[in-house]
Swiss-Prot record:
Phosphorylation of dTMP to form dTDP in both de novo and salvage pathways of dTTP synthesis. It is an enzyme of class 2 (transferase). This is Thymidylate kinase. GO terms for cellular component: cytosol. InterPro entries: P-loop_NTPase, Thymidylate_kin-like_dom, Thymidylate_kinase. PANTHER family: THYMIDYLATE KINASE, UMP-CMP KINASE 2, MITOCHONDRIAL. HAMAP family: Thymidylate_kinase (MF_00165). Belongs to the thymidylate kinase family. Its EC number is 2.7.4.9. GO terms for molecular function: ATP binding; dTMP kinase activity. Signal peptide: none annotated. It comes from Methylococcus capsulatus (strain ATCC 33009 / NCIMB 11132 / Bath). It comes from the Bacteria. One of its GO terms (biological process) is dTDP biosynthetic process.
Amino acid sequence: MTPGKFITLEGGEGVGKSTNVDFVVSRLRARGLKVVATREPGGTAFGEAVREIFLRQDTVRPEAELLLLFAARVHHLREVIEPALRRGDWVVCDRFTDASYAYQGAGRGIAPGVIDFLRDWIQAGLRPDLTLLLDAPVDTGLKRAHQRSGPDRLEREDSAFFARVREGYLALARAEPGRIRVIDADRPLALVQTAIATQVDSLLAGHV
């Protein structure tokens, strides 16, 4: 059986990841593909428990953040992502390991080598086939996020933190342009989704 493909959507707060996960899933299903939609932290009972701690606990040290996320990622990979890919399903995930580099690495100051070690140990070479990095100015994203709901623990960080996160993401995209495609999310949704559709269709055609 041909393994499925793994698509991730990344970006800072308020860039539209959840909306566009739904869009990507719908586009793939319209092609007759079996698709698993999931998120990080989350995707499993363990992961959702970590998500609650991660977003609601008043204080979580950077090292604890990183280790919690990778603990949740172990369950997510073994219970959801890897079995789906082996079945030939496609997986669409709202955030994955790139978020650890952007938030805990660039944002919190944890050395990339520490994250490299955890990634290589836990993922054993598994990488997304395509990552859609939704990018918007920090102020725009935070305004959208705060309009959506009350701020969670992460969203209460200052704009300097999110500027570091954004630059961390863009640095990843510069380092891996073949996998990570930057999508300008500071424009009408229809235009954002046209750009996303182009990248997804390219993967479907085997060109990514």
